[in-house]
Amino acid sequence: MKGLILVGGYGTRLRPLTLTLPKPLVEFGNKPMILHQVESLAAAGVKDIVLAVNYRPEVMIETLKKYEEKYGVNITFSVETEPLGTAGPLKLAEEILCKDDTPFFVLNSDVICDYPFAELAEFHKKNNAEATIVATKVEEPSKYGVIVHKQGTSKIDRFVEKPVEFVGNRINAGIYILNPSVVDLIDLRPTSIEKETFPQLAARESLYSFDLEGYWMDVGQPKDFLSGTCLYLSSLSKKNPEALVPTSEPYVTGGNVLVDPTAKISPQAKIGPNVVIGPGAVIGEGARLSRCVVLANSTIKPHAFVKNSIIGWNGRVGRWARIENVSVFGDDVEVKDEVYVNGGRVLPHKTISGNIEKPEIIM
């Protein structure tokens, strides 16, 4: 089988982290975001994976080529000379995606969930569909484009963008399985699969939706990255609890704590719930961490407080410092002792010596 991951562009919503690495290589749950998807595709029997990229492909090629042998897949980079939207990349990769008549998966690189690739393929085949969209239920459908089905079926009738009145609560989850014939509907230009291709398929009654069970999150911006981390850790606690630090560990409070084995943590620290600590990180005594991500080689000094924030690589948070309210630090940021940061977006290589009392970008 084949799969295409829409990697896309600059990752501006996740800056300042993406000033250092392309978004798919930023660690989510202590491994590059895109690796979650490559692993899941490989586990479902996918052998050919195409990455549609238009920003810094050389960094990704170097990193991802080493995963080919590990997962038994062929990874091809399809490099766009201009951004081609969500449908154009399929046409650009037509030679691989349409090399035989079997269907292929397409997914957005920002999406984190329990990827249901095997079940999706079975559903697609059973319904003799031309295209199948994974759908997820949301509490506030008025914020999204909503899927409307033909009554009593999983066949899609139409899409309603940000409906004022309730028409349904299922939205496009950014994961598809498509027959090669779908590529014939696409031109090699910047084009949207959601707005241009899917309505054509719905009109010929060959577009279906598959309901996703479990969690789903588009983690393309910091607050959603943190929410997605909580959902991922919660899923891990049910499906692979041995991956998490046991709650019997002295420093764990509240559970759902994921720590790289090379991190050094004081038994007198208080960590949790919903914390990820990367390789080489050092957490001092009395430090208090909750609902946060600490990336590789960062140091949280004694009695510092970090909540609802992302500490970038090689960061240093001083004694008794307080970091909260979706603060995001780029690479190599230092916060001095006793400094308060409230919602600061701090660019790489900065030193923060005074309080940041309201959310702002620190250049």
Swiss-Prot record:
Its EC number is 2.7.7.13. One of its GO terms (molecular function) is GTP binding. CDD domains: M1P_guanylylT_B_like_N. It catalyses: alpha-D-mannose 1-phosphate + GTP + H(+) = GDP-alpha-D-mannose + diphosphate. It comes from the Eukaryota. One of its GO terms (biological process) is GDP-mannose biosynthetic process. It is found in: Cytoplasm. The keyword Cytoplasm applies. Belongs to the transferase hexapeptide repeat family. Involved in cell wall synthesis where it is required for glycosylation. Involved in cell cycle progression through cell-size checkpoint. This is Mannose-1-phosphate guanyltransferase. The gene is MPG1.
